[in-house]
C-alpha cells in the first residue's frame, strides 16, 4: 500500500532543500484580477536582472498563465519540467503553459492544483538564484496556499488599484497573507492617480507601506 503522507513528506523535503538555496523569494499577489499583478511581477524580475541579480520567475497562475506571453515566448513548449526557459543571462522563467496545449483550459480541483504546484517546485532546477519571483493567481485560493506552505521564508508583495473594490479585496489579501505567515513587504498601487493624502490614509488603513507604480524605478 502506498503511503501518501510519506510521499508528500519526501517531496516537501526536496522542495525545502531547493528553496533554501534561493536568497530571496517574493510572491506577487492581488485580491482581484486586472490590477497589473503579472505586469508588476515581470517588471520587478526584469529590473532586478538588469542590475546583475540572478532571477527566476515562476508562473503559478494555473488558470491564466500569462508570464510567457508578457516575455514574448507565447507558444513555447519545453520537454522537461526541470529546465526553466532562459530569457537572458540573468533571467529565466517557468510556467505550466510550457507543458499543456495553448487552447486547453485547466479544469482542476483543489488537490490537483496543489499537486501541480508541488511538482513544479520540486522539479524545476533553478540552479543559483538571488531572487525567485512567483506570479500568483488573483484571490486567496489553493495555489496561493500551496506556495505559502512550500516556500519557506517567502515575502509577499500585494498589487492593487485605486478603486474601492480593489482596495477592499487587497485588505482581504493582506489578512490572508498574514494568516499564512507570509511576510508582507508592502503594497503597490498600480494605475495610480490619487494624491499624497489619500496614499497616507490608505497606508494607515492597511498598516502597510504603499508605493505608487511610477516610483518603482
Where do the protein language model's features map onto the residues?
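Phosphate-binding/switch loop-helix module in NTP-utilizing enzymes
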Residues: 100-150
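Conserved catalytic-core segment of NTP-binding enzymes
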Residues: 8, 131, 137-217
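Phosphate-binding loop that captures ATP/GTP phosphates
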Residues: 54-56, 60-107, 114, 122
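Extreme N-terminal, non-catalytic leader segments
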Residues: 1-35, 76
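Loop/turn-to-beta-strand initiation segments
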Residues: 90-92, 128-132, 155
